[in-house]
């Protein structure tokens, strides 16, 4: 996209710190996930696709009906897939927790569920790196029924894989 094929100088690469918009500030998270190997666990694919969708449409927080439709509008899981082991995505994902924390308390139940899941994973990277050993509590066992994820098989997938 540059005239004459001139490469973009290094100065165009901006750090996450210093951006005002939460969705932009968290861009490095999406980049870090996208470059991860495609051999991902189902649980990681679900978590990352959910995070990417929320970051890409922050306005959805103001419209619970839209935010409660996870099947619409997020990138292909195969592209954003991340491995269950072996790279430090949690340090890079810190802006996600900040962006979620700024959401008004009147958020939809679906948003509350997603935010709690993200916060739990960010707060325990050592445990999240060994998802098989982390058994999902019974409270997380029915997201499709209580949070409107639109299908028991889809909604229960992360629980079956365990975090």
From Swiss-Prot:
Protein name (Swiss-Prot/TrEMBL): Cuticle protein 38
Renumbered ranges of Sequence repeats: 7-10, 13-16, 20-23, 26-29, 56-59, 62-65, 68-71, 75-78, 81-84, 93-96, 123-126, 135-138, 141-144, 156-159
GO molecular function: structural constituent of cuticle
Function: Component of the cuticle of migratory locust which contains more than 100 different structural proteins.
Membrane-spanning intervals of the chain: none
Keyword entries, A-Z: Cuticle, Repeat
Keyword Protein biosynthesis: no
Domain free text: The tetrapeptide (A-A-P-[AV]) repeats found throughout the protein are also present in many proteins constituting the protective envelope of other species.
């Amino acid at each position: 996209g540059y005239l004459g094929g001139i490469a973009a100088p290094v100065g165009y690469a901006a750090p996450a710190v210093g951006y005002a918009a939460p969705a932009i500030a968290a861009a490095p998270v999406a980049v870090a996930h996208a470059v991860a190997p495609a051999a991902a666990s189902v649980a990681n694919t679900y978590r990352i696709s959910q995070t990417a969708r929320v970051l890409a449409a922050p306005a959805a927080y103001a419209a619970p009906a839209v935010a409660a439709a996870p099947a619409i509008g997020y990138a292909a899981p195969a592209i954003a897939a991340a491995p269950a082991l072996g790279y430090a995505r949690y340090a890079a994902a810190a802006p996600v927790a900040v962006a979620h924390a700024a959401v008004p308390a009147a958020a939809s139940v679906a948003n509350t569920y997603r935010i709690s899941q993200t916060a739990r994973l960010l707060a325990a990277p050592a445990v999240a790196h060994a998802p098989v050993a982390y058994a999902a509590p019974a409270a997380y066992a029915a997201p499709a029924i209580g949070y409107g994820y639109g299908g028991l098989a889809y909604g229960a997938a992360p629980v079956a894989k365990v975090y």
